Amino acid sequence: MPEDAPALRQETLLRLGAQIRHSPARSGVNGARRLAAQTAAANGWYYMDWLANDDNPEYHRRVTGPAIVQSIAREGKSAVDAIVIGVGSGGTVTGVGETIKAWTNDVRIAAVEPYESQALGGGLTGPHGISDLGYGFVPENFNAYVVDNVVAVNTTDAQRAAQKVLRTLAILPGRQIVNTL
């Protein structure tokens, strides 16, 4: 993982028994991917690239997407205008989007990325403060054909929204949720 990965993530992995190898922070996620692939090849291990492995969106085609379809069907299609999904690996938005679009075109799919790193929207990419989104490139798992629009979220606005939810509802939103608020 990049040497600047969140400390809590590193601590959690270590507690689970992982051995962590760091790639330079400046090389970002792609540097970590290269290091993981090289390490796997050198040791005869299988490298499961979460950004290019169809098992990722397939899970969301089989589980998350159908659960959302059932929920919308229960409430009525007119009750939901859009589903907003933060894009990191592209697996969730692709799997859910494909499932929803196979069922109906009446529900829009919005993909969220950091304003400061707009690879999906074709803009400039760069550093930002939203963990697990906006890697600076379009992940292989991302299916643009199921996305109706891409929304860029400013890091500061995402953090403020998370703080507001925590203060008003006493809910600590996860990293992906912060971006869709």
Which sequence ranges carry the predicted segments?
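Generic beta-sheet signal
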Residues: S23, W50, A110-V112
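Surface-exposed amphipathic alpha-helices with a cationic face
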Residues: L14, G97-T104
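Short glycine/serine/threonine-rich phosphate/pyrophosphate-binding segments
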Residues: M1, P6-Q10, G86-G97, Q176-L181
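Active-site/ligand-binding-proximal alpha/beta "capping" segment
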Residues: N43-G90, V96-T99, A144, T156-G174
